[in-house]
Amino acid sequence: MKKTIKVLVIEDNEYYNNALSNAIQQSVNPMLAKGNYQLVLRSFTNATEYIRKIKSKELECDYTAVFIDYYLGEGLNAGHVIELIKEHSGDALVVMLSQEKTVKEKSDQVPYDYFVVKDKFAPSLCGLYLQQYIENKYSVSLDQ
């Protein structure tokens, strides 16, 4: 039976959401090719919609890793969503992203594992964080 790696991306910018999702997919492709794992990648550009689906139990909240923008629009920030995620997926890797470096200092009450500044390297960096987390959690090498 295949182990499932569940990844959540919440980024309100559709272009960046796609770039991040693609980088994450590419980062785990070597492991998926070995056949023992499968990836379930859920992506949202609207955090309110995600919260509604979790609260209505339309979606489960049992992620291996979460990549989330700090500013989500509609008065929401990553802290609101991470709190909900941690209730259900306590050991999930949480990578918070923002264009503003100062967000890291502002968000010291938000439980995240890594903070990534959104630049041209951020999607690849997120992919590397996921690779490292999977290698450690499942004792598997992602080397090609």
Predicted regions and their residues:
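Conserved phosphotransfer microenvironments
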Residues: 47, 57-85
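Two-component signal transduction core modules
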Residues: 66, 94, 115-116
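Receiver (REC) domain switch/output surface
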Residues: 109, 125-144
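A generic structural motif
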Residues: 28-42, 61, 92
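Helix N-cap/capping motif at the beta->alpha junctions
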Residues: 29, 43-52, 77-78
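Conserved sequence signature across two-component system core domains
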Residues: 10-11, 44, 66
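Conserved acidic segment of CheY-like receiver
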Residues: 4-25
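Alpha4 helix (beta4-alpha4-beta5 surface) of REC/receiver domains from two-component response regulators
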Residues: 76, 80, 98-120, 124-128
